[in-house]
């Protein structure tokens, strides 16, 4: 081998580093954070993350430009689609009650580099999302005062004509972010109390809108004379669904907060289900009364609800709507500031991000450094940048996280379950017994070997029909089927999204491609379903695996393909920056990297029964104990 060139063994070792998994610890209730959040706290955090400015702006935009009164169907379909992703988060959040959300879920099932990239994108999602909401909050308040704040700033500082920068510095948006960061740094209890207050006001205002809206409803506004219920047809409903889907992306704050929940195994799935139901009900009912109060084609997209009440002679109701809108945006702001430092804390605690962000304040028991640093960064973005061009960039990071979490659910279900971290030795008997361990290099012989089927093996009832799969080692056929499932989902999504006109295929070619992609997708799904899964856990589990996460993967892929190419270019650039951070810092400081040298020198332990209560433990060296270092290979 030429000097200086890495050997095959070194390359394999490098790939193992990239794909190493974080051990899935079932007993993970111990934490340096304070477990003080109840189911109600988590539910209101989720509602606050989902029911924000979208209710007051998005509803009117989709109704007027995309779906008409059928906007309620768009919200319904979007809620069902979000439910698929929410179920995946619920299972992981209950089973792994640690902070980190999609980052942690990917780390324990798919590998380190994938987890870092997901965490890196979620970080940007919260950073830009919080800044965008702060600017929307500032703009809404400025509009109430007839844009006097903007006029004052422009008259004293002038108008900026620099690309990517705002036309004027938004000091109000930056100020509200700094104030909110100060409150969030006081502890989870203070953040929860603020969120309770704003969420309660927001829900009361929503209830007021629904009740008064139904009183003022005119069924004639859905008649054929006004364009009918679905003036844009089925395609308009689907286009509205793609937009409405982003109204439900805030539920992951619940999973990110699971390490501070009192009873996460029960509270996390319950809070996700309740908050998603409340948010879906609010969006569907508000969109219904909005299009019943006034004709859909006369709506003002910028302030649809306030304008609708004004048209019906209830201008005073516009003030109540404004109060509800401000409170709703406050809850979204708190949700972003609450979640972002905890994602960074999880990455720093694992060694993949700078260690300073893993520090927890001894009194408030929150990652105060991350809160203040990223609160200031968020304030700078809101102060200086024009965020309109970056808003769509948020969706791709969210959808990618949803896709990886759904894939991780399939991986986890077909993996062999990890045993307890401190297994009790069984009483000695006449035969050797075997214990599994987190490490591949440690084996305790002490539990009787059985021939029971393991996760990843073909179901016994199907062996006569699928015998060619029975020869595969456990998990091999599952891994191939999952890879083919994801590839076929991308192919099928391309066919469905771009259509015959964009692909420039003859009709028969388009139909053939659709049939082949669909058949491969279904076949890989059936192969996955033909294998054993883990036994039912004590915590919440998704029904119909692998069907439910597979549908989530397909849907998320379709929505990602509908994004513009500029969004994809920005996304690729951000990924490249993340790879520089990972290879420059994360891969060398990873806690799993520090664990590996110990694992390489760990002996195998065999328990020999002695016929008494005492057992003799002897160290048995592996067959190839000392790894040979090859030239050009550096650890």
Swiss-Prot record:
Glycans are attached at residues 146, 151, 195, 221. It is found in: Membrane. It is a multi-pass membrane protein. Keywords: Amino-acid transport, Glycoprotein, Membrane, Phosphoprotein, Transmembrane, Transmembrane helix, Transport. The modification Phosphoserine is found at residues 422, 427. One of its GO terms (cellular component) is membrane. The chain crosses the membrane at residues 42-62, 66-86, 113-133, 197-217, 229-249, 270-290, 318-338, 365-385, 391-411, 478-498, 508-528, 539-559, 567-587. It holds the Pfam family AA_permease_C. Gene3D superfamilies: Amino acid/polyamine transporter I (1.20.1740.10). One of its GO terms (molecular function) is carboxylic acid transmembrane transporter activity. Involved in the transport of the cationic amino acids (arginine, lysine and ornithine). Belongs to the amino acid-polyamine-organocation (APC) superfamily. Cationic amino acid transporter (CAT) (TC 2.A.3.3) family. This is Cationic amino acid transporter 4. It comes from Mus musculus. The lineage of its organism: Eukaryota, Metazoa, Chordata, Craniata, Vertebrata. The gene is Slc7a4.
